[in-house]
Amino acid sequence: MDIDARIKAYKFVAYSAVTFSVVAVVSVFITLPMVYNYVNNVKKQIHTDVNFCKVSARDIWSEVHLIKDAPGNNTRVARQAYSTGGAGGGGGGGGGGCDGCCNPGPPGPGGSPGKPGKPGKPGAPGAPGNPGKGASAPCEPVTQPPCQPCPGGPPGPAGPAGPPGPPGPDGNPGSPAGPSGPGPAGPPGPAGPAGNDGAPGAPGGPGEPGASEQGGPGEPGPAGPPGPAGPAGNDGAPGTGGPGPAGPKGPPGAAGAPGADGNPGGPGTAGKPGGEGEKGICPKYCAIDGGVFFEDGTRRR
């Protein structure tokens, strides 16, 4: 009996081990593809986010360069905002023009997105920076001169004729007519059919001799063929009219080359001196949990 019990126990242990092994292998076959798929999706998402950040950074840099390269003189201070001329960079505002006031044209169609670039190599660590300077007072805001309104353009051509309107409502009924009299006589009826031929009459007597008379001119004949072309006529008198009306406005020309940089402005006034910085303190000791204790009794993490 003891041997049978041991055999049953060994069989139970063997079956249990085989069962757990099969379950473990099946679990590995199921979980490995799921983990691989999850990691692949996370990798794709991170790659997409990195490309989006690169494209956004590239767009921001391009806009910064456009703003930096935009023509204009922004070095004037408030006292020069309303000047009408002068030497250096201040002379551009005295022409009375309105080049910067007109609205720009509609934006062009967006270009196709470029291919993502290859990731660059990590740069070398930079050298430690110099100690910062004290804060300077904010610059006085520059008041921009008001723009002169552009003159109104000529009236446009007349539009096409509109569609016909809907039919109007029915009119009111007319007043009743009075008693009518007899109408006018109708037109004569058509001629009746020809009658039968009559009996031949008796022969007549000899007639009187006819008088010879000269007939009048006949009707004019048809027009003959056109004759040869005559010699060229003399030049006409010069016209008295003025020049014709101006033609339509042509298409806008290509963008011109950027103008030369203006003369540098004068040096600005010195700013107010900044306040004194806080007194530096050294940490007294550092705690194990990351806190730092200073001599004044404060603690920072």
Curated annotation (Swiss-Prot):
Compositionally biased region (Pro residues): 143-170, 179-191, 219-229
One Gene Ontology term of the molecular function aspect: structural constituent of cuticle
UniProt entry keywords in alphabetical sequence: Collagen, Cuticle, Disulfide bond, Repeat, Signal
Signal peptide: 1-37
Cited InterPro entries: Col_cuticle_N (IPR002486)
Composition bias type Gly residues, residue spans: 201-218, 262-274
Tissues in which the protein is found: Syncytial dorsal and ventral epidermis.
Chain intervals for the UniProt region annotation (Disordered): 109-284
GO cellular component: collagen trimer
Start and end residues of each stretch annotated as Triple-helical region: 105-134, 153-176, 183-212, 215-282
Low complexity composition-biased segments: 252-261
Subunit structure: Collagen polypeptide chains are complexed within the cuticle by disulfide bonds and other types of covalent cross-links.
Function: Nematode cuticles are composed largely of collagen-like proteins. The cuticle functions both as an exoskeleton and as a barrier to protect the worm from its environment.
Family indicated by similarity: Belongs to the cuticular collagen family.
Name used for this protein in its record: Cuticle collagen 2
Organism (species): Caenorhabditis elegans
Gene designation per UniProt: col-2
